[in-house]
Every structure is written in C-alpha cells, then in structure tokens.
C-alpha cells in the first residue's frame, strides 16, 4: 500500500509541475489554447483525480 501511495504522490507532483510550466506557455503562445485545450482539461482532470487518490491512500497509511 505504501508503494501505491508513493507512486500516486510522485504522479501528483509530476503532473503539478507539468501543469505549472505548461499552462502559461500554452496560454502565451498564439493559437495555443485552441489547439491544446483538450490536453489542458485532461491534465486538470488527472490532477483532481490524483488529489483524491492520494487523500484516500493516505487515510489507509496514516
């Protein structure tokens, strides 16, 4: 269970870093938003899912 928690936490940190760097770059580029809107929404959805997964796994560990 600890391995699953650590993997989910690492994935959350990695997706957070990618979104923090990637979203401003996408918004600053010309026509970037219209071309990559689905990728941004998919990343945000994955981030929200991982927040819940980390919270649930944390309740089993702590």
Curated annotation (Swiss-Prot):
Q: Where in the cell is it found?
A: Plastid, Chloroplast thylakoid membrane
Positions the record marks as coiled coil are: none
| Entry GO terms, CC | chloroplast thylakoid membrane; photosystem II reaction center
Q: Name one GO biological process term.
A: photosynthesis
Spans traversing the lipid bilayer: 8-28, 41-61
Q: Which UniProt keywords apply?
A: Chloroplast, Membrane, Photosynthesis, Photosystem II, Plastid, Reaction center, Thylakoid, Transmembrane, Transmembrane helix
Query: Where the protein is mainly located, per its record?
Result: plastid
| Xref: Gene3D superfamilies | Photosystem II PsbZ, reaction centre
Bilayer topology reads: Multi-pass membrane protein
Q: NCBIfam families in the record, alphabetically?
A: PS_II_psbZ (TIGR03043)
Provide the function of this protein.
May control the interaction of photosystem II (PSII) cores with the light-harvesting antenna, regulates electron flow through the 2 photosystem reaction centers. PSII is a light-driven water plastoquinone oxidoreductase, using light energy to abstract electrons from H(2)O, generating a proton gradient subsequently used for ATP formation.
Quaternary structure, from the entry = PSII is composed of 1 copy each of membrane proteins PsbA, PsbB, PsbC, PsbD, PsbE, PsbF, PsbH, PsbI, PsbJ, PsbK, PsbL, PsbM, PsbT, PsbY, PsbZ, Psb30/Ycf12, at least 3 peripheral proteins of the oxygen-evolving complex and a large number of cofactors. It forms dimeric complexes.
Stated family? Belongs to the PsbZ family.
Indicate what this protein is called per its UniProt record: Photosystem II reaction center protein Z
Q: Which gene encodes it?
A: psbZ
């Amino acid at each position: 269970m600890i391995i699953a928690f650590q993997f989910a936490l690492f994935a959350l940190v990695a997706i957070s870093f990618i979104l923090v760097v990637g979203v401003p770059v996408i918004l600053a580029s010309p026509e970037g938003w219209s071309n990559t809107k689905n990728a941004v929404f998919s990343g945000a959805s994955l981030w929200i899912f991982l927040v819940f997964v980390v919270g649930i796994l944390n309740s089993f560990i702590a």
